[in-house]
């Protein structure tokens, strides 16, 4: 669609336009640039929606779009029917059948500060004649937009957003997403046919694990949860979609019919009530965190609150959505061709930025994997200064053609590691240098190899200092033995001082020596000693996970722990025996088998036992008071974190599951419970208990 030369011209124009302010442009100046500005925006739409290869950040795109809007607002005679402000960009690739939405699936107008929100409120009040407006405020999910249609209580069609008028029909793919009910009793609300809008998401922790597994296997990483979700719902095979841990949140009813009449604004009068109804029907919705605000000041306060706590939310959100709550006002407020006038998005700080690669260094991981890391010109992304980013492996570098000196688009989503989305090749000067992989380990100088079928180079020396340090860091980490005070920096310091060389050395530390190390006082040494002693009591699965067996994550570690009485029992398992355990294939089984048939590893486990680290289940733990019972949690607990509650249940022999099903024995309900409560009530087989009853059940276990 665009030649390389034209793309370079448009990139150059992009950065020129980003410096402009519509308020300072005369009509003649605006007239000269407006068509080029439209072309620049169309170009970026094409890069984003069709190629999925943006060359600017979302924030920069929004600035360009706002510049065009402001110019057209100042000089309406410059508006053309084909202007990007008059339509929604398309993402259709014609892989799936195209279907027309019942109502247009428009974008939202964006705001970035209090002034924008107050301006929105002023316009709403002027058009409605109200002194104070009631707004609903909810998180703006950063996922893949979908539209769902239910007829006579059955889910009959699902589609992507597409160009807003026409989307791609992906019903079969959406049917495998468990948070989309295949039927819902809309008829009890007098609704025959309904169209619902939503977003497909991947929870941040599951996305992180997905990328960690792909990184370990040398597969290309997903840039962010949104890209992973958008790509997943458009896979050709629904069974593959089902493996991706997708969830769907619905956030709006756009059409509700009874006897051919639309009930919105008459029978269904308030947006917040509609979301509550969807919530009660078993859909996943923002209802638990939605707030109805009277006046714009309450709205601003709630948006600021969420900007502070955004990273604590389980899903990636990029802002808040503010809607006029009274649906009967929507006709009066109306629409532009791009967005409704009764809603606006308040966007959080940008998560993407462009910067330059200064250099590339090579780091060695605990399994010997050698990872190239780009050192960047420091850049602020989402309130955090980013100065380095993993380049994954040689294949990733070659595929994206990354070079030292390149300008790159970097994204940092929530607690997800920074990621190079793409190289801005149009910004190259000719001075960029190819990245050369080392021939030997950068830590110990040993030869490096690239095993058949793998994308990563590995150091073959298991005593390589970098590998040893990374194994120690992993062992002490929160998800493993959780040794507070034994940070990465402390481990490196202890290693350099020759205080630790192996995992058992952690339990042989000379605390009298540590007292003399700068930065360690009597109190910090005492705290470290207590934390190390406490770690000896951790559940068996944490020890297995902490040993750093390749491909063995937390879930697989739990599977192994539940299959044995003591860790030594694992040396008696053949590869075939291991493959009979849930979710363990040949590759993982081979790594486990090799680990427990390595004499050095068996010697290490024996040393840990002699140092009184728990290597067996205690009988009461294996057959604890909660043995065989499955728990699910919903809402916020006062007594402790969800992670701590999970740890207690597992220490007493129980299991904690993510979703409600007939396998679940107890649903523990905290404050602001989600849709799991309705599902449990609907099933009728799950015992629903509150926090107080849960505490009685666990019988005085320490929740701190």
UniProtKB/Swiss-Prot annotation:
Keyword set, alphabetical order: DNA damage, DNA repair, DNA replication, Ligase, Magnesium, Manganese, Metal-binding, NAD, Zinc
Domain BRCT: 621-704
InterPro entries, per the entry: BRCT_dom, BRCT_dom_sf, DisA/LigA_HHH, DNA_ligase, DNA_ligase_AS, DNA_ligase_CS, DNAligase_adenylation, DNAligase_N
Catalysed reactions listed for this entry: NAD(+) + (deoxyribonucleotide)n-3'-hydroxyl + 5'-phospho-(deoxyribonucleotide)m = (deoxyribonucleotide)n+m + AMP + beta-nicotinamide D-nucleotide
Binding site for Zn(2+): 441, 444, 459, 464
Pfam families: BRCT, DNA_ligase_aden, DNA_ligase_OB, DNA_ligase_ZBD, HHH_2, HHH_5, Nlig-Ia
Positions of the catalytic residues: 140 (n6-amp-lysine intermediate)
EC category: ligase
Cofactor: Mg(2+); Mn(2+)
The protein's Enzyme Commission number: 6.5.1.2
Domain of life: Bacteria
Single GO term (MF): DNA binding
Residue sites binding NAD(+) per the record: 58-62, 107-108, 138, 161, 199, 323, 347
Family in the record: Belongs to the NAD-dependent DNA ligase family. LigA subfamily.
HAMAP family, alphabetized: DNA_ligase_A (MF_01588)
Protein name in the entry: DNA ligase
Gene source species: Sulfurihydrogenibium sp. (strain YO3AOP1)
Name of the encoding gene: ligA
